[in-house]
Amino acid sequence: METEDWFKLKRYPHIGEPLSLKDYKWIKAYVENPVSVKKHSFLPLIHKCIIKRKYRADTVNLVRNKKTGERMRFIDKPKVRHIYYASHLDSIVFSYYNHLISEAYEKLIATKNFNESIVAYRKIPITKGSDKNKCNIDFAKSTFEFIKKNEEKKLTAIVADVTAFFDNLDHKVLKKQWCKVLNLKTLPEDHYNVFKALTKLRYVESDQLFNSYKGSMLVERGVPNSYKEKEIKRIEIESNKYFKEKNAVAYCTKEEFIQNNLNLIISGKNKKGIPQGSPISATLANVYMLSFDQEVYDKVEAIGGYYQRYSDDLIIVCEQKYEDEIIKYIRDKVQNLAKLEIHPSKTTVYRFEEINGIFKGYEIDEKSKERNYNKSLEYLGFIFDGQRVLIKDSGFSKFYRSMKRSFKKSTSLALYSKNPDKRIFKPKLYKRFTHRGAKRKLIYHPSKTDPTIYERTKKYYWGNYLSYIYKANDSMRSLNDGRDIIKRQSRKFWNQFHKLMRFHESRLIKQK
């Protein structure tokens, strides 16, 4: 069945059972009817905290590990992201209105001179008429190319990160810009109901809802002696990390929630901010920054500079003589026009100039102007020092940690499964963590009428992290003097993979 792009089914557990393709017709009629959406009662969001550990190389002391020779790392303050999940029907309502607002935004921004400077959450074709869109690799490359093309000048690159972007969006500014995109003086009643659902935050803590049912969840199970039939039943689950394994589909039904859990609803008295994680949040972030983007672009263009914004990360490249003026200007516009804030520690200043005949980039202290030649421009996951482009080490570290976790999990499954061989399932690991799974392929499924025939789908197997590395290498090769510098960064993964394989296979042998 052909469906609209905005019809996106989710499988995460929420209040009420997930929707299915069978629901498409009535959902389409419902969300496309402004009267229905105007009266729609949104369920509370479910709130979770995602905590990510952050490791940083010590660029001050430059102490190296005696065994490996690598720079020592320290654990930085963990990054906490507050994610809010909408119920399944609410999510599709948000998705549909995201579609409407996104279309209106794209139509408006196409008439603006800063159209190509706003790059996050948008489908920007690689070339005009192409069905392939740009990604962060292309956006970073265009920034580095601008610097490289102007290497006869003394340049400054200012990278700023807006503090707690989604949490601090001013509701009055958002509403004003929303109206601007729709070319209306006030929001229609259906749009206003969606606006209220996002700004008058009501949510439930996931752990509290889980515990209120004594650690049990509604799960989907197959019916005995039936190939197709499914049933929903409540079972006890030890913790939320087993939700996917047990095929948990809901914390409770809508009726159970109304009867038992209304006391768990937290009404956030938030005068600013929208929930991060809803299908509409990303588009609204771009809508919110419309006036800011216009004024900053005009200012930077007037001095022959370069401006690009990727969500809450923005970069400006200008001549060094405008450095202090632009830093002050950006802070003023973020605070007074966008009603947001840039934390001083989140603003990094780099300079590019010729040193001893070599065009070189380095970091400077904003106040003291002290130079740090050990730090180069970091933007969108890449490092650029004026001569070459590399992928940041943090990306490789994340991939390696993921590899280690997968080996541990595979070993545990081999040890405690009913499989008498007690062997690691190698094909899956090779596909996920080596070049063998790096090729991107179109997915084919067996035909429903004839299982011996495979039919082409619209889905792709997008490869693994090495696919991204190879793509980045090909794209950045022109900036790396035709060399495969980025590809060389990944050479150690093959040895690391087999080192882990030998270690975990020896563990299994000892356990037999």
Language-model segment annotations:
Residues I118-K123, I315-C318, T348-I358:
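Beta-rich nucleic-acid/ligand-interaction surfaces
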Residues M1-K79, S490-K512:
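Non-catalytic, polymerase-adjacent accessory regions of viral genome-replication enzymes
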Residues P78-E116, T163-F166, K269-D298:
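Conserved pre-motif C helix in the palm subdomain of viral-like polymerases
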Residues Q320-P344:
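Helical (often loop-to-helix) elements that flank the catalytic cores of nucleotide-handling enzymes
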Residues F195-S212, T347-D365:
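Short, conserved secondary-structure transition motifs
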Residues E152-Y310, I315-Y329, N374:
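Conserved polymerase palm-domain catalytic core
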Residues S87, S91, S95-Y97, A104, ...:
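Right-hand nucleic-acid polymerase module
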Residues N98-H171, Y192-G215:
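Active-site-proximal segment of RNA-dependent polymerases
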